[in-house]
């Protein structure tokens, strides 16, 4: 049974924000290392990029883009709560943030990622 | 110390809001145009504006990510104190070093 | 549909940190509150059950406990509302407090944090000569008024995940009170207060889950009080820089 306070939109927002942030923080060093392969010439990078055409990798890439967009949207919500005088309509705002993240993902899918 | 970390987190977030929007727009544009890695590099090679913008991006990430991780680790694991702070400072330096190296690699590609 | 003539099954926490749920059967009555149920159990079935209440009318906050997973005032919670679609009423002591026995918790830590956050008024050195005129419509007074109705019931503290994850965190009640005093133009203790709420266990730990605001029976919003403290903390940090 999930605790009542965990079935609130504010908690879901914080959890998504945290999990997406963790995923991004863990992914980034790998991203930087992969790009750094370009230093050694085209061949090592190209052979690495061949790996990234596998469907599982493409799914992970898509998920990371969604994670990035969602993390930013939810982070902007936190900053808005801290800085702006308007009262947050939590459920609607959180849904909007998650929606924005998924929209970016959709745009990526539709544009042939 | 804590107020400074909080402020650094929020300021780097503001920088990242701009940088991430730029990055996402670029990713979607590149996917839409069906660009290969070689196509991307042809646009970034020798592009000083790219190097500066992404250098700032890397710097903001190197500040933002470790501070966020610090909260997560302190709250969800028993790890805290100086040991944790030192490990995260090291992670920040790692991100900075690898990130700037990556930006440079793409600049020189 | 539940048979409204059948007795209500009530699972009650017995023990302290370690313990078990004990099930009682309580006759239903119209409009009964959870406090009615607990009182019935203690008076008619098991006098060893420990619980707290005082005013019975939603003014003191003494009867706060976790009812079917939600922290509530039992005197102001109808059984029907608490049950929802469930058929069993489950009563637990407030979360994030040390349990003394059964449904009664130790409130000392909660009030210690109130003091640690400097949640008390500091008068000026010469009160008689220092008569403050405080317009009720001023932004500061409105900010203070938004939070002063807190009666220290502990529900927000129970609902807060960060309190559960970091036992040093001052918590929404203490910080909400601190914010009302930051906005009290008569108060002279803000330097120490801002130090307290800007420290390692202070306002920056709030991750805007908003459970405090969600469950506060007085309709207060500690989340926004804490946001105010964060802004004040940053302003202070920037103002100090040469």
Q: Can you say where each PLM-predicted feature lies in the sequence?
A:
Chain B
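Membrane-embedded alpha-helical bundles that constitute the cytochrome b-like, heme-associated redox core
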Residues: 1-109
């Amino acid at each position: 049974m999930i605790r009542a306070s965990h079935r609130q939109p504010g908690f879901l927002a914080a959890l998504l924000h945290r999990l997406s942030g963790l995923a991004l923080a863990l992914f980034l060093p790998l991203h930087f290392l992969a790009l750094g392969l370009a230093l050694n010439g085209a061949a090592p990078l190209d052979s690495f990029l061949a790996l990234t055409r596998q469907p599982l990798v493409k799914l992970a890439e898509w998920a990371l883009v969604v994670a990035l967009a969602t993390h930013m949207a939810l982070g902007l919500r936190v900053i808005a709560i801290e800085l702006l005088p308007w009262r947050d309509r939590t459920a609607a705002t959180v849904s909007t943030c998650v929606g924005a993240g998924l929209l970016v993902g959709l745009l990526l899918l539709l544009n042939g990622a | 110390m804590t107020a400074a970390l909080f402020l650094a987190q929020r300021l780097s977030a503001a920088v990242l809001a701009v940088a991430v929007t730029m990055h996402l727009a670029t990713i979607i544009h590149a996917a839409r145009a069906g660009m290969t890695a070689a196509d991307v590099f042809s646009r970034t090679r020798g592009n000083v504006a790219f190097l500066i913008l992404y250098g700032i991006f890397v710097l903001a990430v190197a500040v933002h990510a470790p501070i966020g991780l610090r909260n997560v680790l302190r709250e969800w694991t028993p790890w805290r104190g100086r040991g944790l702070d030192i490990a995260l400072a090291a992670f920040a330096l790692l991100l900075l070093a690898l990130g700037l190296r990556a930006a440079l690699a793409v600049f020189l590609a | 549909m539940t048979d409204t003539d059948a007795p209500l099954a009530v699972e009650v926490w017995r023990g302290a940190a370690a313990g078990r749920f004990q099930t009682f059967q309580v006759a239903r009555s119209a409009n009964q509150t959870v406090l009615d149920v607990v009182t019935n159990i203690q008076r008619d079935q098991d006098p060893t059950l420990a619980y707290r209440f005082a005013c019975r009318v939603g003014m003191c906050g003494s009867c706060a406990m976790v009812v079917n997973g939600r922290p509530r005032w039992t005197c102001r919670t109808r059984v029907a509302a608490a049950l929802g679609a469930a058929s069993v009423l489950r009563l637990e002591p407030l979360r994030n407090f040390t349990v003394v026995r059964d449904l009664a918790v130790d409130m000392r830590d909660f009030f210690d944090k109130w003091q640690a956050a400097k949640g008390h008024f500091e008068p000026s050195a010469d009160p008689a000569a220092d008569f403050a005129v405080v317009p009720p419509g001023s932004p500061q007074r409105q900010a203070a008024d938004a939070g002063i109705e807190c009666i220290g019931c502990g529900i927000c503290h129970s609902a807060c995940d960060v309190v559960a994850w970091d036992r040093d965190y001052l918590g929404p009640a203490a910080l909400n009170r601190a914010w009302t005093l930051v906005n009290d133009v008569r108060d002279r203790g803000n330097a120490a207060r801002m130090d307290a709420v800007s420290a390692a266990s202070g306002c920056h730990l709030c991750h805007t889950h908003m459970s405090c605001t969600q469950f506060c029976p007085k309709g207060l919003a500690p989340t926004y009080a804490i946001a105010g403290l964060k802004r004040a903390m940053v302003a202070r940090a920037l103002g100090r820089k040469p």
